[in-house]
Curated annotation (Swiss-Prot):
Disulfide bond recorded as keyword: no
Tissues where the protein occurs: Expressed by the venom gland.
Official protein name in the record: Mastoparan-V2
Presence of keyword Cell inner membrane: no
Broad class of where this protein is predominantly found: secreted
Naturally occurring in which organism (per UniProt): Vespula vulgaris
Functional note: Antimicrobial peptide with high activity on Gram-positive (S.mutans, and S.aureus), and Gram-negative bacteria (S.enterica), as well as on fungi (C.albicans, C.glabrata, and C.neoformans). Shows a potent hemolysis on human erythrocytes. Together with phospholipase A1, stimulates prostaglandin E2 release from murine peritoneal cells and macrophages. Its mast cell degranulation activity may be related to the activation of G-protein coupled receptors in mast cells as well as interaction with other proteins located in cell endosomal membranes in the mast cells.
Family: Belongs to the MCD family. Mastoparan subfamily.
Length: 15
């Protein structure tokens, strides 16, 4: 699991 990618996706979704 790529946490950096997932974290980026979550950040983008919360934007």
């Amino acid at each position: 699991i790529n946490w950096k990618k997932i974290k980026s996706l979550i950040k983008a979704a919360m934007s």
